[in-house]
Amino acid sequence: SGDPVTIVVLGGDGSVDEVICGLQNLSRVTLGYIPIGSGNDFGRGLALPSDTMKALDLVLHSEQTRKINLGVLHYHDKVHRFAVSSGIGYDAAICHQLCISRVKVFFNRLGLGKLAYAACSLYRLRRCQPDEMEILLDDTKSLHFKRVFFASAFNLPYEGGGCKFCPDAKP
């Protein structure tokens, strides 16, 4: 239906990403966020409360909303929306490593989730190889690079559990 809907995400950046990618009609969605992930760069980038109860209070009682722009990546015949960042190469390999290894679970149980990013970064750094890449900007300008380790687009300043990769990013 065309009725407005509110969705509250309890999770981290991956949960926000999954919800955003799964939505069909973003113009009628209000998104609430309660940060319980390991990185929480979405909330950090929007200056939302990191405390779970304060975030819940904001979701339940705030009458203010704000619109944010989402990044959109077109890859062959696929479209991927993102709220925080999107990348290929080294940074994507780190995210993939976090998803398939037990390192993130281990560090999260110790309350040291940010160290998981550092551990996976070091692990992937030794295995990183450059590749050729072509970027097509707005379907008009093509840029070719011979040795690329990674390429990232940022919608928010932070990635990787609080690393300020793109300080001037504004959603």
Locate predicted features.
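Hydrophobic structural packing positions in well-ordered secondary structure
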Residues: 13-16, 35, 94, 151
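Conserved residues at the C-terminal ends of beta-strands
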Residues: 10, 74, 154
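Catalytic core of DAGKc-family lipid kinases
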Residues: 25-147
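Short glycine-/acidic-enriched loop or helix-start segments at secondary-structure transitions
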Residues: 18-21, 43-44, 93, 162-163
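Glycine-rich nucleotide phosphate-binding loop and flanking beta-alpha elements
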Residues: 14-16, 40, 157-159
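Conserved residues at beta->alpha junctions
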Residues: 10-11, 85
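Internal anion-binding site segments
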Residues: 126, 137-141, 146-171
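ATP/NTP phosphate-donor binding region
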Residues: 1-10, 17-25, 53-56, 64
